[in-house]
Amino acid sequence: MEMVRLSKLMFTFCIAVLIPTIRGNISELDEYWSQRADEAREFTLQAYHSDPYEIVDHFHERHYDNSTDVTTPEEDGDAKPEEEEKEFIEMLGSSTNSTRRSLRGKGKGKWSKLKGPCTASNPIDKCWRCRSDWAKRRKKLTRCVRGFGHRTTGGKRGRIYVVTSNLDEDMVNPKPGTLRHAVIQKEPLWIIFKNDMSIRLNQELLINSHKTIDARGANVHVAHGAGITMQFVKNVIIHGLHIHHISESSGGMIRDSVDHFGMRTRADGDGLSIYGSSNIWLDHISMSKCQDGLIDAIVGSTGITISNSHFTHHNDVMLLGAQNTNEADKHMQVTVAYNHFGKGLVQRMPRIRWGFVHVVNNDYTHWELYAIGGSQGPTILSHGNRFIAPPHKPHYREVTKRDYASEDEWKHWNWRSDKDVFMNGAYFRQSGNPQYKCAHTRQQMIKPKNGLAVSKLTKYAGALDCRVGRRC
């Protein structure tokens, strides 16, 4: 108990020192932003788990709830424990060694040619995808999140807000019906889209707390403009967006709340930027071709799950912790699960400083330099992933890359691999305690599927073509 108190005290000190000195894209840290930063510090402390292994267990826990508004195992197709071995064998039945993905077309009709019963194959998707009435039960999605973001509820307690316009013309007084007008509201909101649309953001989109952006039922692209920022906020869900061709923006006067706007400096061109924020869930997102990173989570952000997403054509994919001197990221906790890291990716899938990251059942079919990297002694648990090394680059077959440390230092970092599958000569250089075992109980833990199964587990990664009245 004393160690836990000491850990939280040190974390509070790190955050207190850090927040006044790092402003992100805020031109002037006025009273409003100072208050937001103070609140973010408290949110981060609340979201931080002193025993992260408990959340690793929670990720694999099956939730059976007898309440009337929860999908039962029979409804969502969840296998009973005695059926798991049979299910796993069936999952291995078709081309597990293939690196090709059968996407059956592009864009609007991506999944329309799929025939037969719904085949949601991972626990998050099983929770909701195979129900034809999902549109009437949108907010039940919050029951499906797992991992470190498991407390995230987004706009569950708010009303539905329908985005009717793709325009983004006024940064200070956005028009009702636009995405920018929706995300700056102070109240919880569940944001959906009236129809298919492509939104070109003229400046970074600043999301307020307690929001869900739910693109199910429409084909929504945020593209060819600025990216999306979550700064000093909590409790945000982003689901089903296509985010691509994001470029840097010049900054200027931008409204971030109904009662505040201020001067923002240049934004680097990240697709999704999580800055000093907590309880964030990113699910079923398709991302590519952003000027800087696809996803950045920095400055003490924690309680994050990134799941079921598809990443392609990018250099610096995912950065978790941006500075070697920023000890506020020491308690960053992130789950990366059921994602497909696909064509045209180079590195950082993810790249971690300081934090604790659970990388589970992801499919790494392409990289150019390395897949998972880090510095400053992060803890990385790699469970049940498939790593396929680049066939044309024999010198880049190592999955891992350690920076800014000699072997005498990094050999103590706890980077462990279990149930991973390696192809084309790929290998994971482990470090830390070779006898390390994550504490699992039968009540809490379902072990990760073997890496051979990830082609099935990640088959529907990325934004889905969900249509009202039909299964996704």
UniProtKB/Swiss-Prot annotation:
Biological pathway: Glycan metabolism; pectin degradation; 2-dehydro-3-deoxy-D-gluconate from pectin: step 2/5
Keyword terms: Calcium, Glycoprotein, Lyase, Metal-binding, Signal
Enzyme class: lyase
UniProt biased composition (Acidic residues): 72-83
Family matches, as InterPro entries: AmbAllergen, Pec_lyase, Pec_lyase_N, Pectin_lyas_fold, Pectin_lyase_fold/virulence, PEL
Record-level GO BP terms: pectin catabolic process
Annotated coiled-coil segments of the chain: none
Annotated catalysed reactions: Eliminative cleavage of (1->4)-alpha-D-galacturonan to give oligosaccharides with 4-deoxy-alpha-D-galact-4-enuronosyl groups at their non-reducing ends
Active site as annotated: 348
Annotated region (Disordered), positions in chain: 64-83
Glycosylation sites: 25, 66, 97
Name of the molecule in the record: Probable pectate lyase 19
Taxonomic path: Eukaryota, Viridiplantae, Streptophyta, Embryophyta, Tracheophyta
